[in-house]
Amino acid sequence: MMDNDNQFWKRFLIFTILMFLFITAYELFYIYYVKPSQPQKTEKKEVVKKEEFKNVNLPQLMLGTFREKQEYKNTKTVKLGIYSLELSEKGGKILRFIDQKYGFDLISKAERELKIFPLEIFTGNPDLDQKLNFGEYEIKEGKNSVELIHKELKVKKILSYKNGAIHLSVEGLKPPFWVFVGSPPDDEAFYTHVGPVLKINGEVVRLDVDDLKGINEFEGNIEFGGEESRYFFKGAKDYQKHIVYKVKLGDKFVSLSTFLYDGEKTIYLGAKDYARLRELGLVDTLDWGTLKIIVKPLFLFLYWIYEHTGSWVLSILVLTFIVRIFLFPLGYKSVVSMQKLQELAPKMEKIKQKYKDDPVKMQEEMMKLYAETGFNPMAGCLPILLQIPIFFALYKVLIITVDLKVSSFLWIPSLADKDPYYILPVIMGLTMILQQKMTPSPDPKQALVGYITSVAFTLLFINFPAGLVLYWTLNNVFNIIQNYLIKEVLLKDKSKGGSKKK
């Protein structure tokens, strides 16, 4: 029966690794294969007349040779709050849009290759659209604002900065018309959604470009819509029609989003910085994933800690500590169960040797031993299983926290990137081995499985963002301290108390 218990713990360790891989795979499946429900149309008060709204022509983006041959030489760099924009006189185009806090350019490689840029205007009239998007503009800079004035048509695009966003108003051109948002920002996905995202009729819809048709229309109460990546979002707020184009670019497809302009709009091209998103009502652009019910509260709690500490490293430390305190009762039961298993090991070995030719009798004797000693083999497994959703939720929280991109730790320049010297993953692996040493298995084979697991996790985490590796390392350290306190303090005090009573 000793073999049965060893097999149980082997299976549990394998199960833990498989659970990690399963949740990761499920996240990817959810992102790329689960079809979102089609949003229902709702009525909303119109800024323009309903008839005009319905009769507006679909935008023709004029992609192709003519556009790709255009050159934009006369440019001007302007500052709008926390953003830096490079604007061209030809077409009044935004050639660069840099979020200065994160040093990130929101203009994607796809947009540069196609030579189509955010906030281009499309009326459905090809001649007018060509003049609007390729004519000459005067660039007039103001205080936290810039005016792009078409020299021939006298159409004026006014971009003004307020509360972390750009407010777009257009003069000299009667709405409704279409405004181009862009394609997804060039950001590493890392198990998060990249592509079109809308909050329409109260439901957040994330779309996979491979599932789209050539032209995809959405109509309803659209709170926000646009294109997203792991850390960045580009889109608009509060409108009623949205179109996503699926365009072939090289050997893959890319999505391009436009929205129907019916009056001044709030445009956001920037990081998914929670402080900004909260101010703008864009918090749901954060990709909470399938464990949203746990991830969102943990994220908000982590951010609350950060607001009071001012350090993301300290915030991760405090959050990990608090979670360990919360899970202490489960950890206590697990350690007690493991210690009980070690105490029973000699008796279990005797039963194994005595009934090695009679598995049924061996099973009966083992169950009798469990009943006499009050040992439950599942008692060590269940507490750990209950912790898994919380650990994976914390993992997701750290994946979507853009602030880690500009947070450093000792030799690591950014907690959002991997450790360039691989020191932290090695430390993490050593803490896992130390945990194995503190709770040794009575079976050498089982101990070997534990060490192999430690090495496997080290290799798995070696290219993970340093913030995740830091969290897992701190979690291991707190677990080591917890096990020490339980074994060397609580259980010894308990046994001393029992001896005194005798």
From Swiss-Prot:
GO biological process: protein insertion into membrane; protein transport
InterPro entries per the UniProt record, alphabetical: Membr_insert_YidC, Membr_insert_YidC_N, YidC/ALB3/OXA1/COX18, YidC/Oxa/ALB_C, YidC_ALB_C
Keywords tagged on the record: Cell membrane, Chaperone, Membrane, Protein transport, Transmembrane, Transmembrane helix, Transport
Superkingdom, taxonomy of origin: Bacteria
Membrane topology: Multi-pass membrane protein
Bilayer-crossing regions: 12-32, 286-306, 312-332, 382-402, 409-429, 452-472
GO cellular component, one term: plasma membrane
Intracellular or extracellular location(s): Cell membrane
Single GO MF descriptor: membrane insertase activity
Function text: Required for the insertion and/or proper folding and/or complex formation of integral membrane proteins into the membrane. Involved in integration of membrane proteins that insert both dependently and independently of the Sec translocase complex, as well as at least some lipoproteins. Aids folding of multispanning membrane proteins.
Family membership: Belongs to the OXA1/ALB3/YidC family. Type 1 subfamily.
Subunit field text: Interacts with the Sec translocase complex via SecD. Specifically interacts with transmembrane segments of nascent integral membrane proteins during membrane integration.
PANTHER family in UniProt: CYTOCHROME C OXIDASE ASSEMBLY PROTEIN COX18, MITOCHONDRIAL (PTHR12428:SF65), OXA1 (PTHR12428)
Protein name as catalogued: Membrane protein insertase YidC
Species of provenance: Aquifex aeolicus (strain VF5)
